[in-house]
């Protein structure tokens, strides 16, 4: 991949400003709208926020890890930064499209790279009904919540909720309960990425529920519809010896 124009994004309040200033001195940067690659310095959260902000530009993202985990990031190598980008591999991520309705009758939509989650707002467990492709699959799930995760997001919140890790090219989604109370032994489902999942919230007055698409939250919802969309693909660049697919495989073996 031959790259001549790169843009640099970072948190100006970062504790790593000395490192960032060093990177800035080594290379010439352009405006984000003119870039062939957007470099994001920080952690997974910084990258996700900027993907949401600039994904409409259809420019590949290259993350440089200065955070804690950095699952979607590349290790810092100041001197070889451009060479690593030139030699990088591309992973295509298809986000989730979430549509929610709230108790005031308002309809909202949002995109998620990692997951869409719904969760109880009070100390009482949430109750909801689940449909897949218009067919009722569970008439009542009692739990702290539930989530739908993409393959890229399956090793994040989904894994913490005891959901499975999906290979990046699997064309599947994880439907995972969060602290399921009833049915107690239900651990979720693996669905084709073409599936449309709908959650209908039961008893919304007594058991209010919120929903999030990655970090964007909606309050007091009555129903949520989730499906994968190929209309807004996201291109992430990874070092050739440190691909996202390799990381997902490694994570399954406790790496």
UniProtKB/Swiss-Prot annotation:
Provide this UniProt record's keywords sorted from A to Z: ATP-binding, Cytoplasm, Kinase, NAD, NADP, Nucleotide-binding, Transferase
Question: Which residues participate in NAD(+) binding?
Answer: 44-45, 49, 114-115, 144, 152, 155-160, 216
One family from Pfam that matches here is NAD_kinase
> Which Gene3D superfamilies does UniProt cross-reference here?
Probable inorganic polyphosphate/atp-NAD kinase, domain 1 (3.40.50.10330), Probable inorganic polyphosphate/atp-NAD kinase, domain 2 (2.60.200.30)
Which InterPro entries does this UniProt record tie to the protein? ATP-NAD_kinase_N (IPR017438), ATP-NAD_kinase_PpnK-typ_C (IPR017437), NAD/diacylglycerol_kinase_sf (IPR016064), NADK (IPR002504)
Q: Does the keyword Zinc-finger apply?
A: no
Instruction: Name a GO CC annotation attached to this entry.
Output: cytoplasm
Needed cofactors: a divalent metal cation
Tell me the Gene Ontology biological-process terms attached to this UniProt entry.
Answer: NAD metabolic process; NADP biosynthetic process
Which superkingdom heads the taxonomic lineage of this protein's source?
A: Bacteria
Top-tier EC class: transferase
Entries under SUPFAM superfamilies matching the protein: NAD kinase/diacylglycerol kinase-like
Enzyme active site? 44 (proton acceptor)
Q: Where in the cell is it found?
A: Cytoplasm
Q: Which molecular function terms from Gene Ontology are attached?
A: ATP binding; metal ion binding; NAD binding; NAD+ kinase activity
* Keyword NAD (UniProt): yes
Q: Which reaction does it catalyse?
A: NAD(+) + ATP = ADP + NADP(+) + H(+)
| The enzyme's E.C. designation | 2.7.1.23
Q: Family, per the entry?
A: Belongs to the NAD kinase family.
Q: Which HAMAP family match?
A: NAD_kinase
- Function of the molecule: Involved in the regulation of the intracellular balance of NAD and NADP, and is a key enzyme in the biosynthesis of NADP. Catalyzes specifically the phosphorylation on 2'-hydroxyl of the adenosine moiety of NAD to yield NADP.
PANTHER family per UniProt? NAD KINASE
Protein name according to UniProt:
NAD kinase
Organism equals Rickettsia rickettsii (strain Sheila Smith)
Higher taxonomy? Bacteria, Pseudomonadati, Pseudomonadota, Alphaproteobacteria, Rickettsiales
């Amino acid at each position: 991949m031959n790259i001549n124009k790169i843009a640099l994004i970072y948190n100006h309040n970062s504790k790593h400003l000395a490192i960032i200033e060093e990177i800035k001195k080594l290379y010439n940067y352009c405006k984000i709208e003119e870039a062939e690659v957007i470099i994001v310095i920080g952690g997974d959260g910084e990258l996700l926020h900027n993907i949401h902000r600039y994904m409409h530009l259809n420019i590949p993202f290259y993350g440089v890890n200065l955070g804690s985990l950095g699952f979607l990031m590349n290790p810092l190598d100041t001197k070889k930064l451009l060479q690593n980008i030139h030699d990088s591999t591309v992973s295509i991520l298809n986000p989730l499209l979430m549509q929610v309705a709230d108790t005031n009758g308002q309809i909202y939509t949002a995109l998620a790279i990692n997951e869409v989650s719904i969760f109880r707002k009070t100390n009482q467990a949430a109750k909801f009904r689940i449909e897949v492709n218009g067919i009722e699959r569970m008439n009542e799930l009692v739990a702290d919540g539930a989530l739908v995760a993409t393959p890229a997001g399956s090793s994040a919140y989904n894994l913490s909720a005891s959901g499975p890790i999906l290979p990046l090219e699997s064309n599947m989604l994880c439907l995972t309960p969060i602290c399921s109370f009833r049915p107690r032994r239900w651990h979720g489902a693996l669905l084709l990425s073409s599936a449309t999942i709908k959650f209908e919230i039961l008893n919304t007055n007594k058991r209010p529920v919120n929903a999030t698409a990655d970090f964007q939250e909606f309050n007091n919802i009555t129903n949520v519809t989730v499906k994968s969309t190929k209309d807004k693909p996201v291109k992430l660049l990874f070092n050739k010896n440190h691909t996202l697919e390799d990381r997902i495989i490694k994570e399954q073996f406790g790496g």
